[in-house]
């Protein structure tokens, strides 16, 4: 028997089959395109997403001799799709970064109360959450709002197509900002402000809970056994944390990709003033009796992509010609010592702790003597200072981390991992698993959450000789951000 983990992302979907010991048997991946129909709009065509998901399931299942007995689905959060009972999907799906709902955030917060909302949901009002996208949909597409039978999130949308049942899990429900994280149920008082009733949303079950078995016609189409179970496993970040063995208090996953995210596990529901002030969420983890809080940098790896395309074209061209990774060449070209130039990596709306839609990148401290190598080093460090800010706030709230487990494309660079460990002051372990979210989903689908399939590769210890140097630079980093508040506002109005 084999277990299949599915990860429905923003730009593509993966399916990976594992045996019962965590050995990878097969995998498949397919991309799809983001849509930008109007200013601020970012959508996916849900029909194409689900079609792609079905194809990768079929492909992965066909590559293994062991029949797939359980499918676990994880996905991006916040995005919902209006559906009809006959299986039709209405319109497109607004993803987390769709900004059209921003005008609804402040009026709703002032009316309901931001702290009151946080005490119920563990989330601070912000445009990414489903609640505000529902308000936008209700006003701007009233026909879709009125005619929709249910609104499903990507994990439960795929599960519905496979089984005919509509269920989601605690973590996905939490990302709507309409879920009571204490009672672990939809919040009637918040849903009332939107004009929604629970019957128009999926039933909520624990992460990894079984939705049903694959419908006979779908099993035949995808090459699955009719008795294969389908589980909704959760929001991709905590599922990925489980996959890399970091769903344990004191540990956190560190996803280093287009977006950087630290997903920490805690053993109790902490709703502290420090977390609230820093926009740091708290909601159930995918592991029972555990909660998660997350800090993220919305423009992490995407800033390095900007460097590649605009500032390091020679390295990128040489790497392409030789079939090498351009980012490794960029990192190798950076200075070997801490830079005296400080980068604020806000090349778009920021992540936590600021959640500032007026984000603006800053390169501070340039001199005639500044070298290109030092500027490249500043980019590597600035992205990491942003995550250090998040981790320092977690520490102030009593959440102490003794290890970060790094996954994602950025974790392949040993040089960058050592820089990050030095700046963060926490041991950083790289992992053998390349598809942590798919592995986490497979673990949950197989009811093996108490096990760890994760294999560490190397731990990078912080070097003491760099500690004070980076603390001094981090203090400057924070001062730059704070001092430029008025300038960011003025720039956004140009």
How should these model regions be labeled?
Residues 180-288, 298-299, 315-329, 411, ...:
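ATP-dependent carbohydrate kinase catalytic cores
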Residues 28-67:
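N-terminal phosphate-binding loop and adjacent alpha-helix
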Residues 49, 110-126, 223-225, 250-254, ...:
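A polyampholytic, Gly/Pro-enriched intrinsically disordered region
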Residues 1-29, 36, 69, 73-111, ...:
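Glycine/Thr-rich phosphate-binding loops that ligate phosphate moieties of nucleotide
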Residues 53-69, 140-145, 188-198, 220, ...:
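Phosphate/pyrophosphate-binding loops at sites that engage ATP/ADP/AMP, CoA/4′-phosphopantetheine
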Residues 2, 8-10, 117-235, 304, ...:
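Gly/Ser/Thr-rich active-site cleft segment
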Residues 22, 44, 70-75, 94-97, ...:
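Active-site nucleophile and cofactor-binding loops and adjacent substrate-binding regions
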